[in-house]
């Protein structure tokens, strides 16, 4: 097993030097030898996240990415969550800009929530951003339980993406078209096969029934005509719909919010035409031919939406923060068990969308990560069992390396000796740890693997059911190329195989 560790630490190093020089007369406690010790300690997150963006105050909720051709960058709007929201007014739309999905600049507040508890947009819900003829549009959800309709679709416009004007005279109300006034949200706009703008909205039929997508069309992004509805999957509410065409295929990315440990994941459907795409959701859904019902990531990646600069298409979602009295409670607080949900909001995570020759999708690392994580750090063996010259042998074999920094890129290759070998990567582990955390590459059968999150050790709970990944094909040569990126407490792991479906199609699994 060959391991390379890269780190981003220039800012941290600069801060340390400045602090050390602030007072020549001050002598603090002696520095602990973190590099030379292996016992457990509970680390804390920095105030802001640099790679998987999180504001210094509050957290990121449902992103709305958009490629701004006028400025040549991505604008990623999102719902700003605070720890202590007002009872009726919350989730103003904030934003960041990025050219590459790995480095961000804050835009601050883009669109405020309403001025009082009785305005329709006292609270804001997610939507989308579009540009036409020099005017930027934000279509968003106005949410207020004090109003006749709890949720309606609203819009705001801007000539420069800086000064926004809410259109107080325009709304789309679900009951006017036979839909629920309580659930009518998450508008998303795209150009369909008829070269008109189409908008889909997540909702329910008025009077009850399974959830559905309401559909509208427009020639000018101003006046909208209702053109019907299409199904969701049985009784599963599919939030944050996002429709796009990539090559010869149409896709609908959605977040399945059914309250069960096997649900609440970002998934996709695919078809050759837009009409066929809508039909994929009929009874007996036509899943993508990827073997895992279109699942793109774990339950720790939600509300994913995409944007393309014409070369690369990226998907942004949020990784939930975890609460608890200590690091061990936080690490397993993932909404395990049917009916439980992870915390809402967290850090902004970006992946590159990989399209395979059969049209199926997987997620890969953002290319700019390679240049961002560019300082090599020594990987020193601190303790081991059953380890010799890069080979681990026997049950319970492991190798423990030195501590990592705040942000890291860990790259290594594993070759297993047979089709049933099981291996993993552990974190928050010391030589004295009675419980620690491992992402396990688990054999599900002879030819399939799945990434599991486990609390191991003599006091560990074992498999954490609501944080596992999805099935993927075992590499034919049993060689796994693995890249892990960390930013504070956020971790993303990519598994690649050089013996994939066809040459070059080696991105097989992503796990946040």
Give the role of each language-model region.
Residues 17-20:
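C-terminal motif of bacterial Sec signal peptides marking the signal peptidase cleavage site
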Residues 1-8:
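Bacterial N-terminal signal peptides that target proteins for export
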Residues 23-512:
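Carbohydrate-active catalytic/glycan-binding domains of CAZyme proteins
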């Amino acid at each position: 097993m060959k391991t390379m560790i890269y780190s981003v630490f220039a800012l941290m190093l600069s801060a340390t030097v400045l602090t050390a020089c602030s007072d020549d007369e001050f002598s603090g406690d002696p520095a602990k030898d973190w590099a030379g010790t292996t016992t457990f300690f509970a680390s804390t997150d920095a105030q802001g996240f640099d790679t998987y963006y999180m504001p210094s105050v509050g957290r990121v909720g449902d992103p709305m990415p958009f490629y701004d051709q006028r400025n040549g960058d991505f604008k990623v709007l999102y719902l700003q969550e605070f720890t202590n929201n007002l009872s009726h007014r919350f989730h103003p739309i904030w934003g960041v800009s990025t050219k590459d999905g790995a480095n961000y600049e804050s835009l601050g507040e883009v669109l405020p929530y309403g001025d009082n508890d009785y305005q329709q947009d006292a609270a804001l819900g997610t939507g989308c951003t579009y540009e036409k003829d020099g005017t930027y549009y934000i279509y968003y959800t106005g949410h207020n339980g004090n109003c006749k309709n709890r949720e309606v679709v609203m819009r705001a416009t801007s000539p420069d993406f800086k000064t926004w004007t809410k259109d107080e005279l325009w709304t789309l109300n679900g009951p006017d078209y036979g839909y629920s006034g309580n659930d009518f949200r998450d508008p998303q706009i795209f150009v369909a096969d008829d070269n008109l703008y189409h908008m889909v909205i997540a909702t329910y039929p008025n009077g009850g029934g399974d959830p559905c997508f309401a559909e509208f069309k427009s020639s000018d992004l101003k006046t909208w005509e209702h053109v019907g509805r299409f199904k969701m999957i049985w009784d599963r509410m599919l939030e944050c719909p996002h429709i796009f065409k990539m090559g010869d295929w149409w896709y609908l990315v959605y977040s399945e919010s059914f309250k069960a440990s096997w649900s609440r994941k970002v998934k996709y459907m695919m078809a050759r035409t837009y009409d066929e795409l809508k039909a994929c959701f009929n009874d007996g859904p036509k899943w993508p031919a990827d073997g895992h019902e279109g699942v793109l990531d774990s339950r720790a990646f939600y509300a994913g939406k995409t944007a393309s600069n014409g070369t690369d298409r990226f998907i942004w979602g949020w990784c939930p923060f975890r609460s608890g009295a200590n690091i061990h409670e936080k690490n397993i607080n993932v909404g395990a068990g049917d009916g439980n949900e992870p915390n809402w909001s967290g850090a902004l995570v970006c992946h590159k969308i990989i399209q395979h020759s059969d049209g199926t999708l997987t997620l890969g690392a953002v290319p700019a990560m390679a240049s961002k994580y560019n300082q090599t750090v020594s990987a020193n063996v601190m303790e081991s069992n059953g380890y010799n010259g890069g080979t681990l042998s026997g049950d319970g074999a492991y190798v423990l390396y030195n501590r990592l920094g705040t942000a890291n890129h860990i790259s290594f290759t594993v070759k297993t000796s047979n089709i049933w070998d099981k291996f993993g990567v552990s974190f928050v582990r010391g030589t004295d740890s009675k419980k620690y955390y491992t992402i396990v590459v688990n054999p599900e059968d002879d030819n399939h693997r799945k990434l599991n999150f486990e609390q191991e050790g003599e006091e560990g709970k074992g498999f954490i059911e609501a944080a596992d990944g999805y099935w993927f094909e075992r590499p034919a040569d049993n060689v796994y190329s693995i890249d892990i990126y960390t930013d504070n407490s956020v971790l993303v792991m990519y598994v690649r195989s050089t013996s994939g479906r066809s040459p070059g199609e080696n991105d097989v699994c992503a796990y946040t």
